[in-house]
Amino acid sequence: MLKLQLSNGQIIEVEEGSTLLPLAQKLSDKYASPIVMGLYNGEECDLQRPLTADGTVDFVEVNNSVGMRVYVRTLLFMLIAATKKLYPDVHLEVRNSLGSALYCKDNSERKLTAEDIRSIEEYMHKMAERREPIKLLRLPKSEAIDMACAICSDDNLALLAQVPDDTVLTINLLEGVPGYLFGPMCPDAGYVPHFELLPYADGVIINYPDDGSWQVLPPFVDQPRLNDAYQEAEEWSAMIHCNTVGKLNKIIDLGYAEKIIQVAEALHEKKLANIADILASHHELKLVLIAGPSSSGKTSTAQRLSIQMAVNGLRPIAISMDDYYKNRVDSPRKADGSYDFECLEAIDLELFNEHLQRLLAGEKVKMPKYNFRTGCREYRGNELQLQENSVLVIEGIHGLNEKLTPSVPAEHKIKIYVSALTPMSFDEYNRIRTTDMRLLRRMVRDSQFRSHDAETTLRTWADVREGEEKYIFPYQSSADIIFNTTLIYEFAVLKKYAEPLLRAVPQSAGMAYTTARRLLNILSYVKPLEDEVIPNNSILREFIGG
């Protein structure tokens, strides 16, 4: 018998080889939404996975961001299985997120019609209605690879081949269709009743509920410019044969890593030069606003773009939004009483816009400097006056929000959205989430420059994401230009820095430990890459240093 300690301290005994599913069903009335996953000794655990040792047990319900990942993974498997059943010659590839939706590209010669997509959606809803079981198979490596041959690409099979021979792998089955998706799934299709499929571009959109509102299906909001940026990155990475982890590993093994670094950095330089050309062509331009989520590389982008602007004869002048914080005594507070420095109201908008108007009118302005120690703005004699061809460059989370600069007419400003839209994936069904890549960047940067351990970064990440959802993502569609800061090789470089930080997170850290173990599993598939040949002005240097 195995002894399991529940989150309330209760210890129960279960048979070795039993699963968490009966226990989850027994405790379901204590949760506000369905339990979709277990935490077994702090690590993510499928409810149908056999237990083999004593340990601690907790459960994850669907109505949060972690549980919603299980929901979406299950939904993807339902889409794969339904498509295989109805249209065996159709091959879908999971591409990128668009808000609370996923875009899947149809790579087959026989393209899905709108009627085909409706048929697939109806089939999936019938799966949910009859609670079609999703079986979990734990197979030796050789057997798992044999079964995976029917569903996995050569790149994914190469990744499976590199795991130790004694590894037991998980394969799922839905109506006889095998699936190899990284991470736990729901026990049956009935757990995911809320979704819709929509024809989109060269494929289909899977629309599903937002985190925290699992029973509400929001309307799909198209973001064509963002999707175009994703598609451009994916097509470029495929063109240079480096769009999967398996291909990146092969490039590293063959000794071609330096070349791929040079090509990726050259792409950034080319894109920034193109943006600078666009800015130079706007003869009335006076203000460039740069915004993006955490660890998207805003600071390096602003610095490198300023150099390219100078090449075009412009005179970029950086202004820090931090210097326009209200004095701390006047700062807004959160519900818990702590200061809210992320909201727009934390900025002295009246003073900021007054200074903008005076600067654009050619006046000399005494510029403030915010003292974070005292919590007050100070004036240290710094004055600014714009010259001919001067352009203000302002980086900050609210740059896309029109309420930040209502005093500046639209013809005098350009808004740039910066984000790390990674095109890298493991295979056609297992993508690398952009948020995970940004989290790795932030964790490494916090360790290198802020003396924060990984546990601290992981604990605060939810608050960071909440701020992004409030203050950045709602305005990204208003950007005039999107710059993608991802570097196709960075996953392999971040591995060297991130793994020791993640291993140091103790099991007592709760969900921070769970996230650390999940990220370590993702990183285990990529081979490490040294960073000596990465140029000093690379956006990646903002995070790894050097």
What residues fall within each predicted segment?
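Conserved NTP phosphate-binding and transfer environment spanning the P-loop NTPase/kinase superfamily
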Residues: 283, 405-546
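Hydrophobic anchor at the beta1->P-loop junction of P-loop NTPases
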Residues: 288-290
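Conserved nucleotide-sensing/catalytic segment adjacent to the nucleotide-binding pocket
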Residues: 317, 326, 330-373
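Glycine-rich phosphate-binding loop used to anchor ATP phosphates in small-molecule kinases
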Residues: 353-411, 458-475
